[in-house]
UniProtKB/Swiss-Prot annotation:
Belongs to the universal ribosomal protein uS15 family. The keyword Phosphoprotein does not apply. One of its GO terms (biological process) is translation. It comes from the Eukaryota. One of its GO terms (cellular component) is cytosolic small ribosomal subunit. Pfam families: Ribosomal_S13_N, Ribosomal_S15. Keywords: Ribonucleoprotein, Ribosomal protein. The lineage of its organism: Eukaryota, Viridiplantae, Streptophyta, Embryophyta, Tracheophyta. This is Small ribosomal subunit protein uS15y. PANTHER family: RIBOSOMAL PROTEIN S15P/S13E, SMALL RIBOSOMAL SUBUNIT PROTEIN US15. GO terms for molecular function: small ribosomal subunit rRNA binding; structural constituent of ribosome.
Length: 151
């Protein structure tokens, strides 16, 4: 699938290894990995940030190959999953930052236009998450209350 508001097709990506078993050099147990995930989630880190920390600092290439389940599933099982999905959260955060910028710079027409694009992405993503039941059907994005969602 291509980009929404530009011409890019977005076809480059990293190739996942075919072998689904953990690497032979990895000596970390699944319970230790889950414990690290819980500790990072309690500090307030998002699932993607947890994955980056595990990869870069602890040498765990794929959590799923070690534990058998993904980071978000582990967090959901322990009740630590974020209430708003991560990609939607960061789009809302971006919209709040643009609105704050527009309060100071009222004549910035390009930012007004970009805010419209970001908010249309938010609405489209929210519609998808309501359909897949990751968000409650009554959830609605409102620009006035958005800053409390990301605070």
């Amino acid at each position: 699938m291509g980009r929404m508001h530009s011409r890019g097709k977005g076809i480059s990506s990293s190739a996942l290894p075919y072998k689904r078993t953990p690497p032979s050099w990895l000596k970390t147990a699944a319970s230790d990995v889950e414990e690290m995930i819980m500790k990072a989630a309690k500090k307030g880190q998002m699932p993607s940030q947890i994955g980056v920390v595990l990869r870069d600092q602890h040498g765990i290439p794929l959590v799923k190959s070690v534990t058998g389940s993904k980071i978000l599933r582990i967090l959901k099982a322990h009740g630590l999953a974020p209430e708003i999905p991560e990609d939607l959260y960061f789009l809302i955060k971006k919209a709040v930052a643009i609105r704050k910028h527009l309060e100071r710079n009222r004549k910035d027409k390009d930012s007004k236009f970009r805010l419209i694009l970001v908010e249309s992405r938010i609405h489209r993503l929210a519609r998808y998450y309501k359909r897949t039941k990751k968000l409650p059907p009554t959830w609605k994005y409102e620009s006035t209350t958005a800053s409390t969602l990301v605070a």
